């Protein structure tokens, strides 16, 4: 991408919020994913409900949903949007890896990629926070946009 194609800079090369006034409202959807690696015992205790701070996945799910709704307060040039759907799901390998997936939907003038990415990131950080007393070596990695639909740029799907 050419630097002239970047939309978050004004003529003086300073940051600006993109003007979406004339864009049409369309359905926009984004899916993001992140993985947190931990000790086998940590994952087993999460599933058994034996983490002192409470139900890790329930709290992380709520944190991720809240994060999707608050993204514009965290990312400076991100537009405030009306989120019409935010969902967080979890999958694991039964050993040491817990994968977090978010789906965020809106009908609006701008996409929800940042909301989906923020949701999985905050969900992963919440898991870390709730389990750090027993496993400080957890690693959050491979946070990425899986898919996005809607808007001028159309559909994007990450390569498998």
UniProtKB/Swiss-Prot annotation:
<comment type="pathway">
    <text>Cofactor biosynthesis; molybdopterin biosynthesis.</text>
</comment>
<dbReference type="InterPro" id="IPR050105">
    <property type="entry name" value="MoCo_biosynth_MoaA/MoaC"/>
</dbReference>
<dbReference type="InterPro" id="IPR002820">
    <property type="entry name" value="Mopterin_CF_biosynth-C_dom"/>
</dbReference>
<dbReference type="InterPro" id="IPR023045">
    <property type="entry name" value="MoaC"/>
</dbReference>
<comment type="subunit">
    <text>Homohexamer; trimer of dimers.</text>
</comment>
<feature type="binding site">
    <location>
        <begin position="114"/>
        <end position="115"/>
    </location>
    <ligand>
        <name>substrate</name>
    </ligand>
</feature>
<dbReference type="Pfam" id="PF01967">
    <property type="entry name" value="MoaC"/>
</dbReference>
<feature type="binding site">
    <location>
        <begin position="77"/>
        <end position="79"/>
    </location>
    <ligand>
        <name>substrate</name>
    </ligand>
</feature>
<dbReference type="InterPro" id="IPR036522">
    <property type="entry name" value="MoaC_sf"/>
</dbReference>
<comment type="function">
    <text>Catalyzes the conversion of (8S)-3',8-cyclo-7,8-dihydroguanosine 5'-triphosphate to cyclic pyranopterin monophosphate (cPMP).</text>
</comment>
<dbReference type="GO" id="GO:0006777">
    <property type="term" value="P:Mo-molybdopterin cofactor biosynthetic process"/>
</dbReference>
<protein>
    <recommendedName>
        <fullName>Cyclic pyranopterin monophosphate synthase</fullName>
        <ecNumber>4.6.1.17</ecNumber>
    </recommendedName>
</protein>
<dbReference type="InterPro" id="IPR047594">
    <property type="entry name" value="MoaC_bact/euk"/>
</dbReference>
<keyword id="KW-0501">Molybdenum cofactor biosynthesis</keyword>
<feature type="active site">
    <location>
        <position position="129"/>
    </location>
</feature>
<dbReference type="GO" id="GO:0061799">
    <property type="term" value="F:cyclic pyranopterin monophosphate synthase activity"/>
</dbReference>
<keyword id="KW-0456">Lyase</keyword>
<comment type="similarity">
    <text>Belongs to the MoaC family.</text>
</comment>
């Amino acid at each position: 991408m050419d630097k002239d194609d970047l939309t978050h800079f004004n003529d003086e090369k300073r940051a600006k919020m993109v003007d979406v006034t004339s864009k049409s409202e369309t359905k926009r959807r984004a899916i993001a994913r992140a993985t947190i690696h931990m000790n086998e015992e940590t994952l087993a205790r999460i599933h058994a409900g034996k983490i002192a701070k409470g139900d890790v996945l329930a709290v992380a799910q709520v944190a991720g949903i809240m994060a999707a709704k608050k993204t514009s307060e965290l990312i400076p040039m991100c537009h405030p949007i009306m989120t019409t759907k935010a969902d967080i799901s979890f999958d694991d390998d039964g050993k040491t890896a817990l994968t977090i997936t978010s789906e965020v939907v809106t009908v609006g003038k701008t996409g929800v990629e940042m909301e989906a990415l923020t949701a999985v990131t905050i969900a992963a950080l919440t898991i870390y926070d709730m389990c750090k007393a027993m496993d400080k070596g957890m690693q959050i990695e491979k946070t990425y946009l899986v898919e996005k639909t809607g808007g001028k740029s159309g559909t994007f799907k990450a390569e498998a």
